[in-house]
Curated annotation (Swiss-Prot):
Biological role: Part of a sulfur-relay system required for 2-thiolation of 5-methylaminomethyl-2-thiouridine (mnm(5)s(2)U) at tRNA wobble positions.
Gene Ontology biological process terms in this record: tRNA wobble position uridine thiolation
Family: Belongs to the DsrH/TusB family.
HAMAP family in alphabetical order: Thiourid_synth_B (MF_01564)
Record flagged with keyword tRNA processing: yes
Keywords: Cytoplasm, tRNA processing
Domain of life: Bacteria
Compartment(s) where it occurs, according to its Swiss-Prot or TrEMBL record: Cytoplasm
Entries under PANTHER family matching the protein: PROTEIN TUSB
Name of protein: Protein TusB
Amino acid sequence: MLHTLMKSPFETNVSLVISMLKKSDDFLALQDGVLIALKDNIFLKSIIMSPVKLYLIKEDVYARGIRKNISREFILINYIHFVSLTLKHKKQMTW
């Protein structure tokens, strides 16, 4: 399953999101969801320890001016790669 976080992690039940992640899943943050990747935030350790690959939409990271402040555990991708992830996963959960 592809889990997409579109809202700020401070407006979402991130603990629930993380508890739902399985090894075969992928996690993508976009829009204000990219804030989950900020270094030293309260959710970072938990999301990094999850068994999934972590992706961020590059354009959203740059639009918020946070590129130098995000964890290296996240992979920056563009919207073309986002489409590839949606094709890879038959199911998607948007948070």
